[in-house]
Amino acid sequence: MGEKATPAVYKRYICSFADCSASYNKNWKLQAHLCKHTGERPFPCTVEGCGKGFVTLFHLTRHSMTHTGEKPCKCDAPDCDLSFTTMTNLRKHYQRAHLSPSLIYECYFADCGQTFKKHNQLKLHQYIHTNQQPFKCNHEGCDKSFSSPSRLKRHEKVHAGYPCQKDSSCSFVGKTWTEYMKHLAASHSEPTICDVCNRKFKNKTHLKDHKRTHEVERVVYKCPRDGCDRTYTKKFGLQSHILSFHEDSRPFACGHPGCGKTFAMKQSLDRHANTHDPEKKKMKKPRPKKSLASRLSGYNPKKLSKTPKSASELGKLPPDGPPDTATAMQNLSIK
């Protein structure tokens, strides 16, 4: 009678950190995992000015290809010339694009049914259903966790801030993206001067709009009222002109003490208000947080409650204007 086969014993490498139950079948996987606890990056990139570090040699090698542009894994499918840095990415591409181009991953939770092109996207989505937040912040003293790597990365900026990258000698670090953008505008903004007439502007958008006035051939909007030959480079300008000049409609009044100016368009009033208080911060209305139920169902009461606005609400021409006014707004005349 033959001896019974001894069952195979699989060795596991267990994380030694408290409150962590992670275990792996290979030692290098455990070593890479431990770096999440210690914050170490034992494989730094040696390219000058890069400064990135990685937890495994494989990740460093893959990253190095971003500097060299090397993509050794080529797709051999007919009429496909794409290349990839790793075989894993090539296999994923081949599966999605050539074997199962219509393959979708559907969420199996009740009353959900959302579909995704990638399995990883489905997996991250399902954390919403299970209320899991497996991506933990490693910053000392911070115990927050998140349902996706992107949310964790966004949170980590709270600790790291936004260092100025415009000038190597600039030591500014913004606490928020808005603060960082304000710094760029104040300290590193490029000159916005018209190279034709030397006029200065607050930003590139205003300069771009102004430059249209110097174009030999440009799209203009001509006032359709009899005896008026005014033209404008924007619909907004023509709308404002007709309302204020021909219709004498200026419903938006400035509330600043001693001012009393009136305007045909709310945008004009907002722009004028800055002359009284240039440092006034534009306060954004906080976006209401969606409940878990609304996120899972996709229900958006705001969208459903929207009703078409009237022409006057949209800042368009008055409904009692001449019949040819609306037509003139649509027809462009080249001056």
Swiss-Prot record:
Keywords: DNA-binding, Metal-binding, Nucleus, Repeat, Ribosome biogenesis, RNA-binding, Transcription, Transcription regulation, Zinc, Zinc-finger. Residues 281-292 have a biased composition (Basic residues). Residues 269-335 are annotated as: Disordered. Residues 269-280 have a biased composition (Basic and acidic residues). Its main location: nucleus. A zinc finger (C2H2-type) spans 13-37, 43-67, 73-98, 105-129, 135-159, 162-188, 192-214, 221-246, 252-276. It comes from the Eukaryota. PROSITE patterns: ZINC_FINGER_C2H2_1, ZINC_FINGER_C2H2_2. GO terms for molecular function: DNA binding; RNA binding; zinc ion binding. One of its GO terms (cellular component) is nucleus. InterPro entries: TFIIIA_Zfn-C2H2 (IPR054599), Zinc_finger_trans_reg (IPR051061), Znf_C2H2_sf (IPR036236), Znf_C2H2_type (IPR013087). It is found in: Nucleus. Involved in ribosomal large subunit biogenesis. Interacts with the internal control region (ICR) of approximately 50 bases within the 5S RNA genes, is required for correct transcription of these genes by RNA polymerase III. Also binds the transcribed 5S RNA's. This is Transcription factor IIIA. It comes from Lithobates pipiens (Northern leopard frog). The lineage of its organism: Eukaryota, Metazoa, Chordata, Craniata, Vertebrata.
